[in-house]
Amino acid sequence: LSTEEMNELESYFPGKFQVTWPRDYEDYVYETEKLINLSGKKYHGKKNHINQFKAAYPDWSYETITDSNVEECFQMALKWRGANGCEEDPEKNQEMCVTLNSLRLFKELHLKGGLLRAGGKVVAFTLGEPVCDDTFVVHIEKAYADVRGAYPLINQQFLEHEVSGYKYVNREDDTGEEGLRTAKLSY
């Protein structure tokens, strides 16, 4: 709703609307190239975490999600759900329903995805789709919390391999979750 549209509505219905801006649902939009390169002081911590991951898991690999490996992501998501108390938290449970259905319907939804392996096992994955010619949106990103550096590396690798043709990446909102907000603001 633009300012002009709001003013027009107000002129037709004086005092009937209250406009608020819910901070919890603001999207985080970044220049893709900056999140691929992670150059400069601002990204020093991210690079350190990535380097720690690479040192701890020298056999690590990145793969595009395909029909042949999407089931492994599904199984990883089930383990992630169990480890993160999703059954007890209605919001987390809903989020996991979306994640699991997105993996089940990966092809039908025309999603792009990437995964990280360490020790031959999937330790992180991400899913998204283009929303216009210059912007790609990341809907889902999961990694095991005890695998240090998995989150920044899946983000960086996915963008490098699948999203580099888009000027911007929208990493969606933080839903008011402080940990997620801190992570997204750190980029």
Task: Enumerate the language-model features and the residues they cover.
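Alpha-helix C-terminal capping segments
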Residues: 13, 53, 103-106, 158-163
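A short amphipathic beta-strand at an alpha->beta junction
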Residues: 1-7, 167-170
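Aromatic (often tryptophan-rich) hydrophobic motifs at membrane interfaces
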Residues: 111-187
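Conserved active-site alpha-helix within GNAT-family acetyltransferase domains
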Residues: 6-21, 48, 175-187
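Acyltransferase donor/substrate-recognition loop-hinge adjacent to the catalytic core
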Residues: 13-87
